[in-house]
Amino acid sequence: MNVFLSKYVNGVDKKSRVSVPANYRAVLGKELFNGVIAYPSIRNDCIEVCGISHIEKLRQMIETLDPYSEERDAFETMIFGEAVQLSFDGEGRVILPQSLMKHAGIEEQACFVGKGVIFEIWQPQNFEKYLNSAQKIAHEKRLTLRNAN
């Protein structure tokens, strides 16, 4: 399966290392880079994480914008300028940069949340708060997922 699914909470050690869930690493197995690309979410106080192929899709979408527009500059700065490549070590861990940990409020634990083509890394209590609001929105908007056929 090529989709990031489920939620996991893993510890972050004193060297800022955290183990990426094995099934997430399996999804990334087809990527050319043995690791992930991480950048601060522009929607939430979390870290968005993906493979090189998704970054390429984002690049293509951003390049459709006017090259001198504020929007394009903002997206390029926030996604590409703030992105970091995180290599897996022999145990499937990555080292989270302090800037990303600070953005997400992560200290001793990290909550991995599958979002299909990406996954997010949250401070666990912050994710629980977000989950409550997401459940309400999903319930209110559930009819938008009807089959259009």
From Swiss-Prot:
Q: Tell me which SUPFAM superfamilies the record gives.
A: AbrB/MazE/MraZ-like
UniProt cross-references to InterPro entries, sorted A to Z: MraZ, MraZ_C, MraZ_dom, MraZ_N, MraZ_sf, SpoVT-AbrB_dom, SpoVT-AbrB_sf
Record-annotated disulphide pairs: none
Among the GO molecular function terms of this UniProt record, one is: DNA-binding transcription factor activity
Domain of life where this protein originates: Bacteria
Q: Does the keyword rRNA-binding apply?
A: no
Per UniProt, subunit arrangement is: Forms oligomers.
Organism field? Rickettsia felis (strain ATCC VR-1525 / URRWXCal2)
Q: Family assignment? A: Belongs to the MraZ family.
Localisation per UniProt entry: Cytoplasm, Nucleoid
One Pfam family it belongs to = MraZ
Task: Kindly report the protein's main subcellular placement as a broad class.
Answer: cytoplasm
Tell me the protein's name. Transcriptional regulator MraZ
Domain SpoVT-AbrB: from-to ranges: 7-54, 83-126
Supply the gene name: mraZ
Q: Which UniProt keywords apply?
A: Cytoplasm, DNA-binding, Repeat, Transcription, Transcription regulation
